[in-house]
Amino acid sequence: MSELLIDNISMRFDLPNGSSVQALKDVTLSLKSGELLSVLGPSGCGKTTLLNIVAGFLAPTAGQITLDGNRVTGPSAERGMVFQQGALFEWMSVRENVGFGPRMKGPLNAETREKVDHLLDVVGLQDFKEKAVYELSGGMQQRVALARCLANEPDVILMDEPLGALDALTREKMQSLVLKLWKETGKTIILITHSVEEALLLGERLLVMAPRPGRIHKEYRLPFADLGVNQDLREVKKHPDYAKTREEILAMIWDMEEEIMGRQETA
């Protein structure tokens, strides 16, 4: 059982003019193996900065990240990343993209090829495996990105607004796919999003972050992700607590945005 511990993380960025920005302050959080966490908040609350620290792309100013007791000091195959733009090799085929990580560890054997084909089947791309990535739609490219991440067998999957650029219908289908993969693989997932609805549907735990400095403002434990594994997401939205929680969070973020605007006007 892998456990991710975010221990009292702070992050300060120094600016060229000699000033600095406190992006995160005293963020502490623990995730057990298989948890699905969504992180939400207004622009400037540090949610992407936090994800980049967990990924090992940034070193925090203070505090530490550990996975199974081992300190995170840089990127690792134990933590897979899915970006808003798929960051795929567009000239390669779908199958070559998904198999890229395993191939970096050595020649693909029959077992690994079978795993790649299984992942393509899971994300619904078996019929497109020989297509070049540039021939695919945005939604299909994000399916490739998910499969490629899973092919590396990470303990933790980090998702930085992976569905933000998709149209509404494709986004809903991808949300259902994320829930399916979460339940089938048992992976720990951290998902960053600007969408309140997405955060509610794709988080059994949901963090609302506040800005300047970025910090955890409130945490929710929600039933909607578990419900969405076996139900149409449009049906999940009819749950009596869904609309209530949605309005509560929208009001919370609206107040944060208003406070930011007020500071700017008086500065």
Where are these regions (language model features)?
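Short helical segment in ABC ATPase nucleotide-binding domains corresponding to the A-loop/adjacent helical element
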Residues: 95-103, 113, 117, 221
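The feature captures the beta-strand-to-loop junction immediately N-terminal to the Walker
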Residues: 40-42
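Conserved signature/switch motifs of ABC ATPase nucleotide-binding domains
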Residues: 131-134, 152
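Signature (C-motif/LSGGQ) region and adjacent switch/coupling loops
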Residues: 20, 75, 95, 121, ...
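Helix-to-loop junction immediately C-terminal to a conserved catalytic motif
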Residues: 55
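Conserved ABC ATPase "signature" region
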Residues: 110-128, 180
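Conserved ABC transporter NBD signature motif
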Residues: 63-75
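Hydrophobic anchor residue at the start of the ABC signature
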Residues: 146
